[in-house]
Amino acid sequence: LDAVEATLMGGVKAIQLREKDLSDYELVELGKKLRLLTSNYGARLFINSRADIAEQIGANGVHLTETSVHANEVKRNFPDLIVGVSTHSLEGAHLAETQGADYITFSPIYETPSKASYGPPQGLDSLRQVTQAVRLPVLALGGITLHRVPECLEHGAFGVALISDIWNSSHIKQHSFKYMQNFGGNTL
């Protein structure tokens, strides 16, 4: 939680809780702590795949995978939640839009060990194709670093989503601040 608070102190305005190996109880308990933190900093909290838990803890939204329940079904059952969907192709982006997503992530843009299972990097040209093809905010994800953000934005990304470059920093608060200060910090 200290690292999350450091990102929030650095100005990050959205956090996604993505802990697939926790029990429901553990997820709820961690979610409650994160909700308190994010609320204190005026940031949004998204829960990975679990709209029921997102609603239970008062999170702002849920983030779905391409293979999970459709966004419009989540919105029908949980109308107050912002619904995002992970996408890994132009077809997936179109599908997420037609199924009612509020935003999408598109990945991996660059080489990254955490997204290796999704195949080779999509690259900036694919990012541009997606951003021009859908009307949703598109967050570039995968291998994002400070020096790569400008080219993602130039290729139409609304913003970026990342883990490693901030988490692996020895100065999380300051590194988070650099992202938010230098690139406008678009948030959903």
Language-model region placement:
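Short alpha-helical segments enriched in small residues
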Residues: 121-124
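Glycine-rich beta-strand-to-loop/alpha-helix junction loops that act as flexible
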Residues: 139-144, 160-164
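Conserved N-terminal beta1-alpha1 strand-loop-helix module at the mouth
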Residues: 1-102, 119, 129, 135-136, ...
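Nucleotide-sugar donor-binding patch of glycosyltransferase catalytic domains
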Residues: 116
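Asp-centered catalytic/switch region of ABC-type ATPase nucleotide-binding domains
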Residues: 157
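Short beta-strands and strand-loop turn motifs
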Residues: 14-18, 105-113, 160-162
